[in-house]
């Protein structure tokens, strides 16, 4: 099984692969509106249990994102317990992504 976390550098490389992993942003809608990574799908952590099985493909790679990495790691572990084997949390969240990969993404 994959490591529970993926580094920003490793995810940046994966984005260009086919099929690219789904980027799942589990932050609140106001956070997503403040700063987001292009192509991300926003399902807030609090809505995950009611939406995951209808909206996420358990066979498709998923990278989960939040602000600093705590919520995304929690959602990653929950999804794995639900049978999603190809899911990883973006280490450091969007904060680290903005610092290390794309400084045009606002920090908050």
Spans of model-derived segments:
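Rhodanese-like catalytic fold shared by cysteine-dependent sulfurtransferases
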Residues: 1-22, 28-61, 70-108
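Short, surface-exposed ligand- or partner-binding patches at beta-edge/loop junctions that are enriched
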Residues: 65
